[in-house]
A protein has these predicted regions:
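Extended, non-catalytic subsegments within catalytic or DNA/protein-binding/adaptor domains
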Residues: 1-231
Length: 231
């Protein structure tokens, strides 16, 4: 029942911690609880000593102030694309992987947003590409939103050109844009998983001579944000 006693909220956070919830998850839950109280006309002191002291205690027990991974910046991006181009693998696979990385970076997409794209979500226009994201992590109401990718000068690192080539070579006309290959290197109808995207990024980082342990599948998105902030 509302309003909740800060001690009860603190106990709830302890319970989540016992289920191996990360510190970032605990903080998000606390913010959400505070927002719900506000919407219902109640006040919850999320800075109450019983809550803050418990959070600090959980952080000490876990011993994990989570280390953030490095963003993939423009220079890293070019090294990744060059590493893909040098691989002795089927050209069609190179087209797919190049498009995944370039689209992920230039659009600041999450991995799950990349793999959820369908052919029907793409609208190639004179200025570039409009992408309809039907659902996203930040889209609380499931209304969807659009992202636009403009044309750039250098075609080798140009996401729209790369994606167009992938669509042409793969002959995809409906359904998932990014798909798995079978063991015989045939393109299937099955959607690629976001875990596979993370593995691909790690693979090409290693091939580019970059220490992959400092990066994650989120590095494409964070690299986009960092590059945008620095530009």
């Amino acid at each position: 029942s509302l309003p909740s006693d800060p001690k009860i909220v603190s106990l709830y956070l302890t319970y989540l911690s016992s289920k191996d919830a990360k510190m970032s998850t605990l903080k998000r839950r606390l913010v959400s609880i505070g927002v719900i109280h506000k919407l219902k006309g109640h006040y919850l002191d999320t800075k109450h000593p019983s809550i803050i002291e418990n959070i600090m205690g959980i952080k000490r027990r876990k011993g994990s102030i989570q280390l953030s991974k490095k963003p993939i910046l423009i220079n890293n991006l070019k090294e990744l694309i060059n590493a893909i181009d040098k691989q002795k693998k089927e050209e069609i696979k190179k087209f797919r992987d190049r498009s995944i990385i370039l689209i992920g970076f230039s659009g600041g997409f999450r991995r799950n947003e990349i793999v959820s794209l369908d052919y029907e979500d793409l609208d190639f226009v004179t200025e570039g590409l409009k992408i309809n994201l039907r659902r996203s992590k930040t889209d609380q109401f499931g209304e969807g939103f659009k992202k636009a990718l403009p044309y750039f000068d250098n075609s080798q690192y140009f996401p729209v050109v790369s994606l167009k080539k992938w669509i042409e070579v793969s002959k995809i006309t409906s359904g998932p844009v990014f798909r798995r290959f079978t063991k015989c290197s045939r393109l299937s109808n099955n959607r690629l998983t976001d875990q596979k995207v993370a593995l691909l990024i790690k693979e090409y980082l290693k091939l580019a001579g970059i220490d992959s342990k400092n990066y994650s599948g989120h590095s494409l998105r964070s690299g986009f944000a960092t590059s945008a902030a620095e530009s």
